A protein has these predicted regions:
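Mature extracytoplasmic/periplasmic domains
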Residues: 141-142, 146, 151-209
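A ligand-binding cleft/hinge motif common to bilobed small-molecule-binding domains
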Residues: 107, 113-131
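Extracytoplasmic ligand-binding site segments that recognize negatively charged/polar headgroups
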Residues: 1-110
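A residue-level marker of the well-folded mature domains of exported/periplasmic proteins
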Residues: 45, 68, 94, 124-134, ...
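Ligand-binding "clamshell"
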Residues: 1-10, 124-136
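Extracellular/periplasmic bilobal clamshell ligand-binding domains
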Residues: 193-231
Length: 231
C-alpha cells in the first residue's frame, strides 16, 4: 500500500517515490536553524547555499516558505510579511554557481549549510563517507512525490495498469531503492529499505502545503524573486 497523504487527491497520478527537501549542515556546525525562516536572521548571512530558483528543489523550498503567508489582498497572493521573508531568505544566501562543489563547501565549512533533496544527501554521505546534520522543522519538510499517470483514451489501459502495479510493487521498489537510493512510497518496501534511509525518514514528516495555491502562483513568485531579491 501507499501512504494516503502522498496520493493525488484527484486520483490521476500513481505515486512511486518521494523526495523530502531538506537543509543539510556540516557535522560540526553548532548553530543549525530550526526552520527555513530562521535563515532570514542576520547571523546566517552568507552561511547557507541555495540552488537556482529555476530548478525543482529551490523552487519548491521557496514556495513552501512564502505560501505560509497567504493574503488574498497581497501581491501575488502573499502578504507584505511574506515578501519580506522572501527578500531576506534569498538575500542572505550564497547562490550556487555552475561547477561549484556545494556539498564539498558544506563539509569544509566554507558554506556550512545547503538545501538538498533527501536521496541526494544519502548518496553524498555514502560517497564522501560523511554524516550531515539535517534540519527538522516542526512544520515538516516539503515532499516532492514522483508519480506516473495513464494517458486518457489509451487503447492499452490494462497494460498500463499492469505496468504501474509492477513498478509500484514492493519488490521492484525495494530493488530500485537499494540500487539508486530512492525513497519508495510503497509502505512494504519502505519497511525494508537500508538503515540510512530508515534513520532519515524517521526524523522527517511532510509539510502540509496548499499545492493548488502553489501551482497557480509559483511561476509568478519565482519571476518576482529573481527580479527583485536574488543577489
Amino acid at each position: 500500500g501507499v501512504d494516503a497523504d502522498l496520493i493525488d487527491p484527484d486520483g490521476y497520478y500513481y505515486p512511486v517515490t518521494t523526495t523530502p527537501l531538506v537543509l543539510m549542515g556540516n557535522a560540526d556546525y553548532d548553530n543549525m536553524p530550526s526552520d527555513w525562516t530562521d535563515l532570514t536572521k542576520d547571523e546566517y548571512k552568507g552561511l547557507y547555499q541555495l540552488h537556482n530558483l529555476g530548478g525543482g528543489t529551490a523552487k519548491t523550498v521557496f514556495a513552501s516558505i512564502i505560501s505560509r503567508y497567504q493574503d488574498p489582498d497581497g501581491d501575488l497572493g502573499i502578504s507584505d510579511e511574506g515578501w519580506e521573508i522572501a527578500a531576506k531568505f534569498l538575500g542572505n544566501a550564497h547562490n550556487i554557481a555552475d561547477g561549484e562543489d556545494a556539498v564539498g563547501s558544506v563539509i569544509d565549512g566554507t558554506y556550512p549549510m545547503d538545501e538538498h533533496w533527501a536521496s541526494g544527501v544519502l548518496t553524498e554521505q555514502k560517497d564522501r563517507d560523511y554524516k550531515f546534520q539535517i534540519m527538522t522543522p516542526d512544520i515538516g519538510e516539503p515532499y516532492v512525490v514522483e508519480s506516473l499517470a495513464i494517458s486518457a483514451g489509451t487503447k492499452k489501459y490494462d497494460t498500463c495498469v499492469a505496468f504501474l502495479n509492477w513498478l509500484g510493487s514492493s519488490d521492484v521498489q525495494l530493488d530500485w531503492s537499494n540500487n539508486y537510493g530512492t525513497i519508495p512510497c510503497q509502505k512494504e518496501a519502505l519497511d525494508q529499505v537500508s538503515d540510512d534511509i530508515k534513520e532519515l525518514m524517521e526524523t522527517l514528516k511532510p509539510q502540509d502545503l496548499d499545492w493548488s495555491f502553489i501551482a497557480e502562483n509559483v511561476d509568478a513568485w519565482v519571476e518576482k524573486a529573481e527580479l527583485e531579491y536574488v543577489q
